[in-house]
């Protein structure tokens, strides 16, 4: 039955359409579906199309279907709202500081707000038929459990780039089935993600030795912020950050991931002294100020943003040219979310530069490594599960005696190349002119479908979709 709801959406990329069909088919078999697709490949656009199909089916059959979309940050809620508007899906928002409009069948809610003790009656009264959870790797938290208790048999979809938990306990206690998309490497080969050059400190560096000796962890199992600050927020290490930026990414647009507000401010100050156009953002930055910085960053008026976990999830700026990792982590989720911010392809970006100043790849391998998502989904009850822990850092103490001056400098670890036949840039087959792009923008603003635009330019539909993506019009 549910598989019949899925419709062909010409604005989706081929793999998104395939994923949408698979999601509806999975709902024929079970209630709770988790879907994995890498950062930067369009999960929000995908589930917005799912919602549009459900709503259309309900209208056609005279059934008022209610849908609740859940996210854990206001930036994600606003991004979801923007995508729903593109599909002309009227909706309300349930989040702190937002005026509620509960007459709409579709509601986008903050998990913190909808499960707050003052709103739990509201959550139950919504009487929803479908629940969509963004960044669903968070869904094992107690706040999400309240939704499962309220709606045990409601159809649910959880989307995430990383179905992974620090304790490796899996997700089978809340989800019935995991659907997995193509790998990062396949998306790069097909041109839907950008290739990269990966620079890192060596495995016998003094920084890794110090990181390996940290023995203070937070409740989730990651390094304690205070311990990280003690090890990483030192002038010599910040100098290494600046030097590696100047050597490999100077003048490029990028994001730096830092440990804390204090660490972020220290990095920002030293980069500014070197003449870099840079700002820092964290959770305490006023929302209007944060939006202004992000807009200026997108417009090219700011070159670098240093942030503390603000841009790990949901941030969309395709023309980011480099990512710098200045914060060690034991979380595969953080690692892939952070490097993934730089892998969106654009017409003017041949590849992304990744500056790994903390040796994260020694813990998690390269961004394009094969991941055992099904094993992580099943968790510890699966005896063949390969834990995402590395012996590299455990062996650092054995390598201390090999430390030499200069080992903290970055070297090229991996350089992904893509054959020209596989590149995402359609300019290989069609030379796009400025006036072509202006016409594309006009047709897009008029909400012409890719098939109509393809007829105008006498190009195949897939080439048009790729060009629209390159221009950030889709």
Report each predicted region and the residues it spans.
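Conserved segment of the helicase C-terminal RecA-like domain
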Residues: 342-371
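Walker A/P-loop
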Residues: 29-50
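Conserved pre-motif I regulatory segment
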Residues: 1-36
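Conserved interdomain linker/interface between the two RecA-like ATPase lobes of SF2 helicase motors
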Residues: 178-255
